[in-house]
Amino acid sequence: MNHLRAEGPASVLAIGTANPENILIQDEFPDYYFRVTKSEHMTQLKEKFRKICDKSMIRKRNCFLNEEHLKQNPRLVEHEMQTLDARQDMLVVEVPKLGKDACAKAIKEWGQPKSKITHLIFTSASTTDMPGADYHCAKLLGLSPSVKRVMMYQLGCYGGGTVLRIAKDIAENNKGARVLAVCCDMTACLFRGPSDSNLELLVGQAIFGDGAAAVIVGAEPDESVGERPIFELVSTGQTFLPNSEGTIGGHIREAGLMFDLHKDVPMLISNNIEKCLIEAFTPIGISDWNSIFWITHPGGKAILDKVEEKLHLKSDKFVDSRHVLSEHGNMSSSTVLFVMDELRKRSLEEGKSTTGDGFEWGVLFGFGPGLTVERVVLRSVPINY
């Protein structure tokens, strides 16, 4: 049966990203948020929110949900109003559309006929429906009706690592497979007005943005037709951290997605991440974490700061994660793929020798509900100028 499996590791062959056109400027967002939610009388809470926004290190975010949508659906701004139907009516349409835009960019970069796509993986925590966003995305793209689909709902911020793990397994165990994997999350599922009794809500309103990212994954790239690897997917792993239950979570209620984020998350991640690194890199003989490139989900500034401090990383190791956080906020599952895209583009622009900032080996980390950690060991490829 080995002849049915690919020879060699799977690689990322193309990357595409997409955001809604509507832009939220972080400096202006506290005034906007408290105005559109009719909460300007909550002056003390507004000042707390302004401080959260100021400390977020976010410059701007993209968001499909704009003021016109809120005028058409005024109940969305109420803190616990029964608005799930209205949110889902929007998101079951918009999530596949934004995902399709990212996929189209990845397919264009790949340069091959979309008829060669054999598998489609889609993840989103923003909506749930049957048939799912995978089906609608496939229809929008005009993929073959026989494309093999996998739909994963409610993974959250570690989903970017999950789609790479599953795409790798599919590509390596099905000779000739070309897997289109897409992540898309949108904040219309959790946007709501402020509450004095729920300060965690303010953090979510301050950091989350809308985005979609897609990759094409395959083994044995066919260079005769122009396929080129960007990163090899060497190994993958997933774990949930001890004593972390309830620190990150999301719960679908009549009022939409209710988000939990505990203040101990940065400490939990920073205290446990080296164990994940040792397990991943001991077989390769690497123990210097400054000798690898980093593609890290920027769940928030505090997470990056704590990990950098704990591992004694050089300040440039998270430059791509910090850039994506600044320009887009936390887009949940797609964010880490935005970071991957930023790293390979910056490596080319700065004349680095490899797609991984000049380093051969690297790691991708996603963090999310559980507290779950998803990691992928990557190998960069040389850049030929």
UniProtKB/Swiss-Prot annotation:
Look up the signal peptide feature and give its range: none
Which residues constitute the catalytic centre?
157
Q: Would the keyword Transferase turn up in this protein's UniProt record?
A: yes
Location relative to the cell:
Cytoplasm
What Gene3D superfamilies does its record include? 3.40.47.10
Entry's Gene Ontology BP terms: polyketide biosynthetic process
GO MF terms held by the record? acyltransferase activity, transferring groups other than amino-acyl groups
Q: In which tissues is it expressed?
A: Expressed in leaves and glandular trichomes.
Key words, A-Z: Acyltransferase, Cytoplasm, Transferase
What is the similarity comment for this entry? Belongs to the thiolase-like superfamily. Chalcone/stilbene synthases family.
Protein name listed in UniProt: Polyketide synthase 2
Which organism's genome codes for this protein? Cannabis sativa
